[in-house]
From Swiss-Prot:
Protein's recorded name: tRNA pseudouridine synthase B
Entries under PANTHER family matching the protein: PSEUDOURIDYLATE SYNTHASE TRUB1, TRNA-PSEUDOURIDINE SYNTHASE
UniProt family annotation: Belongs to the pseudouridine synthase TruB family. Type 1 subfamily.
One biological process term in Gene Ontology: tRNA pseudouridine synthesis
Signal peptide annotation: none
Chain's role: Responsible for synthesis of pseudouridine from uracil-55 in the psi GC loop of transfer RNAs.
InterPro entries the UniProt entry points to: PsdUridine_synth_cat_dom_sf, PsdUridine_synth_N, tRNA_psdUridine_synth_TruB, TruB_C
Enzyme's top EC category: isomerase
Gene source species: Caulobacter sp. (strain K31)
EC code: 5.4.99.25
Catalytic reaction(s) noted: uridine(55) in tRNA = pseudouridine(55) in tRNA
GO molecular function ontology, one term from the record: tRNA pseudouridine(55) synthase activity
Active site: D47 (nucleophile)
């Protein structure tokens, strides 16, 4: 006899405004407790010292996490000039110092090479694995290692304010795997200066934005008032860029059983018109209910992820 899962069968997304000095794992645990959810996860780690958008998946929404991991992101951050650190942020130990204080104009003059597809070496204090171990664990233990250069995409990088000679505020829009701390490290080097990230806030992950994010305390207060449903977003929120196809009740039943369905010629043509080249992923919907994520092959839809939603 199968063991009954602990918690409630709640499914959906939470757009959390993660507070300062809280790990992403701890944020997941607190939200899971608030909802008494059977299962929870997050779509992309946010450093403890960073604040902002942390999309959290509950229940069946965890099946859609991989689709959000590839989404574009946006950040707002502050550079503090004068000191380089081990962690590339204000919490690290000083590795170098300088009296150089780049002006706004000087920074803007060197931004162009940091926009587009660029080569970036991730910070040693990162979650990247090295021979099966997290880089940040090796760094804390004093183990010497080198991370490989990776290709990342920066869609936009702009200076937004220069509050004083020691600080500069910027905004960045980028693809997955781009590290703000590495951008600041390399920007300071290009200017012959020392600098680190003083403040960091993620403002967007895909369609999840800071304007719709909810604070952790607010969420926990809703839990006490039995109003958590007000903060819960549909499972398909993370699938905004994936074409949707309405299916009949009969086809929905077949897909739920893991069986393929045959598409009408007009359905094939309509999907081809919206699918990007090389992409065959389609979400099958029965009314407002997500039935399955499917792959379109030879005029049929083959279920890849089936959702148990009511």
């Amino acid at each position: 006899m199968a063991r009954r899962k602990k918690g409630d069968a709640i499914s959906g997304w939470i757009c959390l405004d993660k507070p300062y000095d809280l790990t992403s794992t701890s944020a997941v645990s607190r939200v899971r407790r608030a909802f008494n959810a059977q299962k929870a996860g997050h779509a992309g780690t946010l450093d403890p010292l960073a604040t902002g958008v942390l999309p959290l998946a509950l229940g069946e929404a965890t099946k859609t996490v991989p689709f959000l991991m590839d989404a574009d992101k946006a950040y707002r951050f502050t550079i503090a000039w004068g000191r380089s650190t081990t962690t590339l942020d204000r919490e690290g130990e000083t590795t170098d110092s300088s009296d150089v204080r780049p002006t706004r104009e000087q920074v803007e003059a060197v931004l162009a090479p940091f926009i587009g597809e660029i080569d970036q070496i991730p910070p040693n204090y990162s979650a990247i694995k090295v021979d099966g171990e997290r880089a940040y664990d090796l760094a804390r233990e004093g183990v010497e290692f080198e991370l490989k250069t990776r290709k990342v995409k920066v869609h936009a990088l702009r200076v937004t304010a220069a509050p004083d000679v020691d600080h500069l505020e910027l905004e960045m829009e980028c693809g997955k795997g781009t590290y703000v701390r590495a951008i600041v490290r390399d920007l300071a080097a290009a200017l012959g200066a020392c600098g680190h990230v003083d403040q960091l806030r993620r403002t967007r992950v895909g369609r999840f934005t800071e304007q719709t994010a909810i604070g952790l305390e607010t969420l926990e207060n809703l839990s006490y008032e039995a109003r958590l449903s007000e903060a819960l977003l549909p499972v398909e929120t993370a699938l905004d860029d994936i074409p949707a196809l309405a299916v009949t009740d009969e086809d929905a039943f077949r897909l739920a059983q893991g069986r393929a369905i045959v598409l009408l010629p007009r359905q094939v043509e309509s999907l081809k018109a919206v699918l990007t080249p090389g992409d065959r992923t389609v979400s099958a919907m029965s009314g407002q209910r997500l039935v399955a994520l499917c792959e379109m092959r030879a005029g049929s839809l083959n279920p890849v992820r089936v959702f148990q939603l009511t």
